[in-house]
């Protein structure tokens, strides 16, 4: 488990959790979907994140999911486990559990939500997690869901810790540019916004933690490859075609749109767990038409 696991990793899929109609996890649906993703340029998988409907997963379900995916992937790409909560002690226990579990390259720890810590509180929270075990930590900064923002200067303080290896940044391009300019060389920056992948990578970010890679991985990879080859004209052309698909995938509360497309394509993504609900038939028809164009 180290930052080297992410060498040349640009596209990490924020993996959905497939459910059966009774609401239980559909473990039988995992192999087909995972093999599809790996065949279409997914270079890493994030489990039990936002797209996985993690607020509705029990702790035992998350561990079962980790074990099942780990067995299927069998070391072919790095795995990241969602380990963060708004309780530092609980998060520490989860980090230790995943570290002991083995086979995961990092844990994704969200900025604590609801209790609105100060910057110093956030700093101490993440330092405590990083000190708790040898599992590398990637910070998940998403104020749109959390309310609290981990400010860039606090992020850079945390980036000095050898066990805090990166960030999934869902703020803005100004922050990404500032982090790229000021971070340690071995600190990874992933945008968590599919629509900003073109700009973030052009600014020097390392990659994207993506929802759209479930359905449009080839396009995303082609864009990343063009940026790496400094063919900005080609990358921009792909981005112009890619953006409407991203907008469609987030036109209804995620992951309802991506599950609608995957179900249409025969991947048994299944329903969502309340309080999230599936797209209406009309919403699904419109989204599928755009995403598959």
Swiss-Prot record:
Gene Ontology annotations for the cellular component aspect, listed alphabetically: cytosol
Residue positions of the active site: 140 (proton donor/acceptor), 168 (schiff-base intermediate with substrate)
Catalytic activity: L-aspartate 4-semialdehyde + pyruvate = (2S,4S)-4-hydroxy-2,3,4,5-tetrahydrodipicolinate + H2O + H(+)
Alphabetical list of SUPFAM superfamilies matching this protein: Aldolase
Disulfide bonds: none
Pfam families found in the cross-reference section: DHDPS
GO biological process: diaminopimelate biosynthetic process; lysine biosynthetic process via diaminopimelate
Pathway the protein contributes to: Amino-acid biosynthesis; L-lysine biosynthesis via DAP pathway; (S)-tetrahydrodipicolinate from L-aspartate: step 3/4
GO molecular function list: 4-hydroxy-tetrahydrodipicolinate synthase activity
TM ranges: none
Top-rank lineage group of the source organism: Bacteria
Recorded family membership: Belongs to the DapA family.
HAMAP family in alphabetical order: DapA (MF_00418)
Protein's recorded name: 4-hydroxy-tetrahydrodipicolinate synthase
Gene name tied to this protein: dapA
